[in-house]
Regions:
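An acidic-aromatic
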Residues: 24-26, 90-150, 284-285
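N-terminal leader/targeting segments and the immediate start of mature chains
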Residues: 22-78, 85, 139-145, 162, ...
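Extended beta-sheet lipid-handling architectures
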Residues: 62-66, 77-79, 89, 96, ...
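Non-transmembrane domains of secretory- and envelope-associated proteins
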Residues: 23-37, 174-176, 211-321
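Flexible, processing/modification-adjacent segments and terminal tails
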Residues: 46, 120-194
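Bacterial N-terminal signal peptides
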Residues: 9-20
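Short helix-loop boundary/capping segments
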Residues: 186-218
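Bacterial N-terminal signal peptides that target proteins for export
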Residues: 1-11
């Protein structure tokens, strides 16, 4: 019998990977100085904002052995301890342990071609996998509402392409934050991503992703930011994430990290980014067909609406616990 529902574990795994973030190896004992201001105007231009956010391009590799993961939507699951290794653009590996399972844990990763999640089910391990391009083409029917590679960028290493910004440009919100909406084309239609940015130091604090039918499919809240002058980036040490699958309840997770190592992998394993050869395995693209049939009885989704206007009154979304 499975100890945890596999779909929930899969989504929990991708959330855990997504919120890895990055920074130099550092202890949390001393309170770091606040990020320095970089804007000398109330509302910077799109180009200035993009330059500030895209400072994360300086991070090519990162590792941590001090992550703690709390699956908020699955209170029966204890906190996980995890190690994570990431190399631009799509290579990552995360191993997380469940104390109550006596060493049996989660193994998930990605390379340029595919991503995978190996999870414990009963006395054996089960591998779920997919090719990036095939999975991205079926996001409207997939078990996970976002591609894991998008999650890594959105939560840990955000980027802003000035050419994708909607006609509203940079909006100064009444709560003091800056807001930017980008249009993200995909085989499943055009998604909309909303960023909330700290107005002085120019780092992302909130991200919202809307499907072509304007459903909210993912959001994140990053906090405990620190500035690292050696790489000139501002990085969060705590992130909360929530996903909204097409069927099933929302999935929420929080991750806290004490220390990071940037631009160096804390592993000498030559197979670090190679998918395991687990015998029991399932293709997530094929499983998406089953998910599609499960949601086939829902009311028809109306055609995609035009890009909505910005509003400085926009809600930040329901707070996670």
């Amino acid at each position: 019998m499975s100890l945890i529902h596999p779909t929930s574990v899969i989504i929990a795994c991708v959330l855990a990977i997504a919120i890895g973030g990055c920074a130099r190896t550092i202890s949390q004992v001393d309170v770091p100085p606040p990020p320095p201001p970089i804007f000398d105007v109330a509302t910077p231009s799109i180009e200035e904002l993009a330059a500030a956010i895209n400072r994360t391009d300086a991070v090519r590799e990162l590792s941590t052995n001090s992550a703690r993961v709390d699956v908020l939507s699955m209170p029966a699951v204890p906190k996980l301890t995890a190690s994570m290794h990431l190399r631009r653009q799509k290579s990552f590996r995360l191993r997380a342990s469940l104390p109550i399972m006596m060493g049996t844990g989660l193994d998930l990763g990605s390379n340029d071609n595919e991503f995978w999640f190996e999870v414990p089910e009963g006395m054996s391990q089960t591998l779920y996998y997919a090719h990036h391009d095939q999975y991205s083409a079926q996001l409207d029917r997939a078990i996970l509402p976002v591609d894991p590679s998008w999650m890594i960028q959105a939560i840990g290493l955000p980027r802003l392409d000035a050419n994708k910004v909607s006609r509203d440009g940079v909006v100064a919100r009444r709560d003091g934050m800056l807001e930017v909406r980008t249009l993200e084309p995909s085989p499943a239609g055009t998604y909309q991503r909303v960023m909330l940015i700290e107005p002085s130091a120019g780092y992302v604090t909130h991200l919202f992703l809307y499907a072509p039918d304007m459903r909210l499919v993912a959001k994140s809240i990053a906090s405990k930011h620190q500035y690292y002058d050696t790489v000139d980036v501002v990085l969060p040490h705590e992130v909360k994430v929530e996903l909204f699958p097409a069927s099933g309840p929302p999935l929420a997770m929080q991750m806290e990290i004490d220390r990071y190592t940037v631009n160096q992998l804390l592993s000498g394993d030559p197979q670090l980014f190679v998918m395991p050869t687990t015998a029991r395995r399932f293709d997530l693209v094929q499983l998406a067909g089953g998910a599609s049939s499960m949601i086939g009885n829902r009311a028809a989704v109306p055609p995609s609406r035009p890009v909505s206007q910005y509003s400085a009154k926009a809600e930040l979304g329901t707070k996670l616990r």
